[in-house]
């Protein structure tokens, strides 16, 4: 009874292996310093041995070693804050283990204990004000004390061991170092038993070559079968132990989900509680699915181990068949057939477990695709998910081919066994002896009955062979159908990959074009900003110039400056007139103004200005669309108001001829100096148009970008003359204009109509862009799902799917 293994580990404490082994000596380096803010000693311990070992391993593995989990990497440095009382307590523990340390511990001043009570806070400060304590040791004394503590800790590590000193100074968090959790202990024990059974089986398999006779080989086969059974038993226990927490989680998650659904159906809950319960149900569903996935993965790993063991046994047995003759090997044929059946069954189980995993992945991708409109509005994600689905579907087809292959192996093995039995039955020889008595004939009748029974057995075996042949034919038909579906899936996968490559190439090409466009736009924006900055600088220079030269500009406008040589005398005098002189504006939109001769056009002038010398009325024709521009340019072109005019000059000469009578040469010079284009026809007025910079010489001071610009105003101020500007004159209404005439005038001018898009109703093109994108995304998702359903319509829908338990016989 004492040697029996306990069924439960209740009340047992698992102890780590090698607990009392001789520990490795580590070279420790201690650093001690006084922390005045905390009133404690800062102690640091470095394991030089572990650090050097780690450096050597890093140099051996290369520049990029594989990362290890944090739990597997032991620390090589420790640090902590210890008060004077804490150091005395650690000294008492270490001195109890090694008495020579008693005289090595340095004397700590009592003032350090007071400094270590900084945690008392305000209360200690008040007591310190009432009864001030003595000053602590100086800086040199503290450094000497820290050096003594370093030497003491080094001696303690040599005498008591580095692990003991570390535990005394830096208590480790967690459980005791000599114990481990029961689950880890049991898992480690089962894994060790499984590894041991696997090693024993491999050792037996390697001993086949030592058997020189068939009898010895059969003994090896028997020992091998026992080793395999032990391996299967231990592996089953180990993997069942691994499956236990996931099965418990699946059961708990399913029960909690059912309870929540029952509560939602039966209880009267508020909306917030309903939302919370629905989220909790989704969380339990997710946990159950994760547990199922883990169970499937562990199952796949178990069958991988059994298949690997059986494959090794079968391969070694096939090698043994080459060493013996056919008659001697006939005794081992049943075991070979049994191994083939076992390997086929285990492979079927492995492939079906893989099929479950792939089906879960496929369903997960399909669920992501169906829930995509609520997550991401991107068609490229749909294409990527579809490509992933095709890849998993191709893997699933490969698994199904393996399943059909192993099913066919099962059928072929059973057919070979039945054919061998039929041949043995047919090859049986019956010898008949001559009969001398009639009674012996009765015995012959019994023998004939036995012969008939043998024929019935042969017929039954042949019927079973026919059934297996029909199953084999159905498997071949399934394989052909599956191959066609696989080819279709490959074609779809190749087509989608080609589309993805084309879209990537197209996007890269257009991305480069868009980058060029963005670069050009950025350069244009920078150019505009630079122009605006230069314009602001010019305006600032103009303002400063006008402020400095205000007096001189006033004298120039009063006629003290010489006339510009490029203008005629009359026109130059006209440009030097004060701002009170009127300028008549003729709009080409007015029909009455077009019909009046140029000399008789309406111009507003004061009586005093009519008698002045050289007063020539200037008529500027402004189109209707330029009225706004004239308003904006008026602010820049107007010079400051001049002072009162000087005394009148001597009597003027006879009045000059009208503007129409000017010579063509003077008109050309005037238009050239003003920078305007001459009218095309003399009988029809034209608006003054600014010349382009390309049509004028760059070195001319009078030719600038447009009339009224900053450069032109600056040049005019320098030469003491004001440029012509467009002035908006309000249209003079007739004195007795009726409402009907206004209406008729508006009708003549016309009304600009807006382009109205007709409402097309339920036409999808009239929907917003977001709705169109959403509909396009939904259509692409539906089309992808339809293609996926066509591809995934495989042998699962067949009604004659064979049950794995059918091949157990």
UniProtKB/Swiss-Prot annotation:
Keywords: Actin-binding, Coiled coil, Cytoplasm, Cytoplasmic vesicle, Golgi apparatus, Membrane, Microtubule, Phosphoprotein, Repeat. Acts as a nucleation-promoting factor (NPF) that stimulates Arp2/3-mediated actin polymerization both at the Golgi apparatus and along tubular membranes. Its activity in membrane tubulation requires F-actin and interaction with microtubules. Proposed to use coordinated actin-nucleating and microtubule-binding activities of distinct WHAMM molecules to drive membrane tubule elongation; when MT-bound can recruit and remodel membrane vesicles but is prevented to activate the Arp2/3 complex. Involved as a regulator of Golgi positioning and morphology. The keyword Nucleotide-binding does not apply. InterPro entries: JMY/WHAMM, JMY/WHAMM_N, WH2_dom. The keyword Cell membrane does not apply. Residues 261-630 are annotated as: Mediates interaction with microtubules. The modification Phosphoserine is found at residues 606, 795. Residues 794-803 have a biased composition (Acidic residues). One of its GO terms (cellular component) is cytoplasm. GO terms for molecular function: actin binding; Arp2/3 complex binding; microtubule binding; small GTPase binding. Residues 515-528 have a biased composition (Basic and acidic residues). Residues 638-659 have a biased composition (Pro residues). It comes from Homo sapiens. Its main location: cytoplasm. Interacts with ACTR3; indicative for an association with the ARP2/3 complex. Associates with microtubules; in vitro binds to tubulin heterodimer in a 1:1 stoichiometry; decorates microtubules with a repeat of 80 A along protofilaments. Interacts with RHOD (in GTP-bound form). Residues 631-809 are annotated as: Mediates actin nucleation. Expressed in brain, lung, heart, colon and kidney (at protein level). This is WASP homolog-associated protein with actin, membranes and microtubules. It comes from the Eukaryota. Residues 506-528, 546-571, 586-612, 627-707, 754-809 are annotated as: Disordered. GO terms for biological process: actin filament organization; Arp2/3 complex-mediated actin nucleation; endoplasmic reticulum to Golgi vesicle-mediated transport; focal adhesion assembly; lamellipodium assembly; plasma membrane tubulation; positive regulation of actin nucleation. Residues 1-260 are annotated as: Mediates association with membranes. Residues 662-673, 763-772 have a biased composition (Polar residues). Residues 709-727, 739-756 form the WH2 domain. Residues 271-298, 384-479, 512-542, 770-797 form a coiled coil.
């Amino acid at each position: 009874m004492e040697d029996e293994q306990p069924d439960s580990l209740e009340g047992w404490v698992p102890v780590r292996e090698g607990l009392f082994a001789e520990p490795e000596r580590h070279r420790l380096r201690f650093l001690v310093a006084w922390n005045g803010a905390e009133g404690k000693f800062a102690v640091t311990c470095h394991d030089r041995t572990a650090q050097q070992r780690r450096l050597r391993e890093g140099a051996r593995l290369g520049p990029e070693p594989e990362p290890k989990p944090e739990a597997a990497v032991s620390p090589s440095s420790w640090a902590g804050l210890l008060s004077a009382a804490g150091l005395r307590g650690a000294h008492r523990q270490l001195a109890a283990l090694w008495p020579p340390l008693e005289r090595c511990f340095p004397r700590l001043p009592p003032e350090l204990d007071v400094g270590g009570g900084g945690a008392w806070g305000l209360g200690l400060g008040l007591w310190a004000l009432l009864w001030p304590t003595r000053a602590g040791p100086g800086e040199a004394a503290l450094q000497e004390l820290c050096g003594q503590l370093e030497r003491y800790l080094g001696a303690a590590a040599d005498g008591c061991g580095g692990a003991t000193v570390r535990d005394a100074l830096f208590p480790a968090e967690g459980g005791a170092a000599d114990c481990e959790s029961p689950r880890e202990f049991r898992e480690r024990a089962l894994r060790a038993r499984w590894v041991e059974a696997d090693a024993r089986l491999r050792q037996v398999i390697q001993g086949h070559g030592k058997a020189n006779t068939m009898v010895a080989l059969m003994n090896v086969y028997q020992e091998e079968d026992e080793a395999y059974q032990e391996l299967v038993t231990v592996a089953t226990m180990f993997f069942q132990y691994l499956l236990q927490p996931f099965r418990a989680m699946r059961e708990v998650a399913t029960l909690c989900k059912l309870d929540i659904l029952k509560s939602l159906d039966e209880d009267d809950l508020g909306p917030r509680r309903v939302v919370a319960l629905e989220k909790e149900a989704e969380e339990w569903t997710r946990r159950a699915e994760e547990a199922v996935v883990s169970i499937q993965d562990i199952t796949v790993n178990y069958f991988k181990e059994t298949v690997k063991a059986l494959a090794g046994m079968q391969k070694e047995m096939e090698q043994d068949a080459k060493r013996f003759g056919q008659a001697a090997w006939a005794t081992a044929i049943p075991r070979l057939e049994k191994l083939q059946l076992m390997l086929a069954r285990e492979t079927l189980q492995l492939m079906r477990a893989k099929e479950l995993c792939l089906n879960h992945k496929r369903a997960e991708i399909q669920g992501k695709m169906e829930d995509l409109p609520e997550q991401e509005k991107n068609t490229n994600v749909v294409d990527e998910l579809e490509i992933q689905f095709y890849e998993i579907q191709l893997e699933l087809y490969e698994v199904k081919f393996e399943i059909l292959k192993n099913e066919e192996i099962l059928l072929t093995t059973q057919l070979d066994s039945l054919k061998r039995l039929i041949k043995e039955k047919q090859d049986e020889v019956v010898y008949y002896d001559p009969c001398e008595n009639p009674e012996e004939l009765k015995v012959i009748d019994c023998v004939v009955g036995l012969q008939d029974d043998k024929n019935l057995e042969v017929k039954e075996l042949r019927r079973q062979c026919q059934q297996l042949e029909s199953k084999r034919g159905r498997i071949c038909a399934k394989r052909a159908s599956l191959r066609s579906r696989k080819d279709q899936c490959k074609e779809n996968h190749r087509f989608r990959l080609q589309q993805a490559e084309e879209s990537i190439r197209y996007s890269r090409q257009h991305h480069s074009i868009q980058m060029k466009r963005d670069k050009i736009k950025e350069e244009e924006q920078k150019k505009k900003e630079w122009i605006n900055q230069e314009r602001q600088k010019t305006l600032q220079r103009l303002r400063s110039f006008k402020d400095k030269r205000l007096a001189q500009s006033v004298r120039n406008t009063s006629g003290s400056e010489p006339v510009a040589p490029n203008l005629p005398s009359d026109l130059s005098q006209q440009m030097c007139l004060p701002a009170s002189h009127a300028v008549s504006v003729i709009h080409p939109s007015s029909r009455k103004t077009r019909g009046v001769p140029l000399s008789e056009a309406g111009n507003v002038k004061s009586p005093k200005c009519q008698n002045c010398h050289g007063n020539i009325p200037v008529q500027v024709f402004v189109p209707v669309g330029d009225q706004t521009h004239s308003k904006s340019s008026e602010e820049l072109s107007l010079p400051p108001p001049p002072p009162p005019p000087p005394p009148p000059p001597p009597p003027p000469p006879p009045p000059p001829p009208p503007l129409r009578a000017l010579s063509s040469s003077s008109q050309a010079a005037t238009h050239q100096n003003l920078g305007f284009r001459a009218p095309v026809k003399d009988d029809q007025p034209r608006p003054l148009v600014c010349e382009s910079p390309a049509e004028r010489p760059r070195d001319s001071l009078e030719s600038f970008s447009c009339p009224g610009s900053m450069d032109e105003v600056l040049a005019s101020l320098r030469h003491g003359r004001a440029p012509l500007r467009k002035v908006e004159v309000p249209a003079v209404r007739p004195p007795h204009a009726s409402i009907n005439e206004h209406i008729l005038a508006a009708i003549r001018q016309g009304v600009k109509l807006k382009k109205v898009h007709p409402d097309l109703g339920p036409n999808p093109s009239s929907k917003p862009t977001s709705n169109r994108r959403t509909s396009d995304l939904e259509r692409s998702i539906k089309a992808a799902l339809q293609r996926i359903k066509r591809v995934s319509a495989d042998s699962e829908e067949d009604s004659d799917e064979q049950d794995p338990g059918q091949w157990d016989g």
